[in-house]
């Protein structure tokens, strides 16, 4: 098996070790804590409103329907659990996006041994949010038309047999784009330039995107793997770009 195909798991494994180190834990724990506080607050508000609704509803029902109060609450708990399961990771990605840029910076400092980036400050983090969200919207703009095209393809007879493998390949490619974009954006590499560079490193990109795609499918584990993927993508960036520069200098 070619070495580039094996590089993805190696980068992710090294990235996981880095984010568990004392100097980088802040950028993992802080967005996770914000996400947890937000979800706890939303669940509390939803529970309070639901309780008021049940208290208002039950007196208006016939007595023989009083058993509904014992059914409504379990249904509410199941609904909340499903909502958390399907939206926690999605919201965590949005909240962590500005922190991921800083995490990529700090990983690069650790790997290179030189700090060419400004020190972390809350002011800079807040100033970074519009740019980060704009970049996330750019990713969404890249993803949606292609996803819609594949969705339509899934309903075309005969042709739809290729839809499943294409969905898988596209998902893997998007994982590479999602995480390599953080170090690329830190170095002000344009969107189209980043895509062109990833295509040049196609085997490495698909290897990295593939392993990230797999681990992010695992509930709970995926929360830790998101920052590990940022760190792994930064290692990918530093080493692959460094190798290119070395070849250019020669």
Swiss-Prot record:
Major location category of this protein: membrane
Subcellular location as annotated: Cell inner membrane
Claim: Cell membrane is one of the keywords in the record: yes
GO term, biological process aspect, one: cysteine biosynthetic process
Protein keywords: Amino-acid biosynthesis, Cell inner membrane, Cell membrane, Cysteine biosynthesis, Membrane, Sulfate transport, Transmembrane, Transmembrane helix, Transport
Bilayer disposition of the protein: Multi-pass membrane protein
GO MF assignments: high-affinity sulfate:proton symporter activity
GO cellular component labels: plasma membrane
InterPro entries: CysZ_sulfate_transptr (IPR050480), Sulfate_CysZ (IPR022985)
Entry's transmembrane regions: 26-46, 71-91, 150-170, 211-231
Role played: High affinity, high specificity proton-dependent sulfate transporter, which mediates sulfate uptake. Provides the sulfur source for the cysteine synthesis pathway.
NCBIfam families registered for this protein in UniProt: PRK04949.1
Family: Belongs to the CysZ family.
Listed name of the protein: Sulfate transporter CysZ
């Amino acid at each position: 098996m070619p070495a580039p195909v094996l590089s993805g798991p190696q980068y992710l494994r090294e990235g996981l070790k880095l984010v568990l180190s004392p100097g980088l834990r802040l950028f993992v724990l802080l967005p996770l804590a914000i996400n947890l506080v937000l979800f706890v607050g939303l669940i509390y508000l939803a529970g309070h409103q639901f309780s008021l609704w049940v208290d208002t509803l039950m007196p208006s029902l016939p007595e023989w329907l009083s058993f509904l109060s014992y059914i409504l609450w379990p249904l509410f708990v199941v609904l909340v659990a499903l909502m958390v399961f399907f939206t926690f990771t999605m919201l965590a990605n949005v909240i962590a996006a500005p922190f991921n840029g800083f995490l990529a910076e700090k990983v690069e400092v650790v790997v290179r041994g030189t700090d060419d980036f400004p020190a972390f400050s809350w002011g800079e983090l807040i100033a970074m949010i519009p740019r980060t969200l704009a970049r996330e919207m750019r990713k969404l703009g890249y993803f949606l038309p292609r996803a819609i095209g594949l969705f339509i393809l899934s309903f075309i007879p005969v042709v739809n047999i290729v839809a499943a493998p294409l969905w898988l390949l596209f998902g893997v490619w998007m994982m590479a784009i999602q995480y390599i974009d953080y170090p690329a954006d830190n170095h002000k590499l344009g969107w189209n330039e980043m895509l062109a560079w990833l295509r040049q490193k196609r085997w490495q990109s698909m290897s990295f995107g593939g392993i990230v795609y797999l681990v992010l499918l695992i509930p709970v584990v995926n929360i830790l793997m998101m920052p590990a993927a940022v760190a792994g993508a930064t290692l990918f960036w530093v080493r692959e770009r460094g190798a290119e520069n070395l070849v250019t200098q020669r």
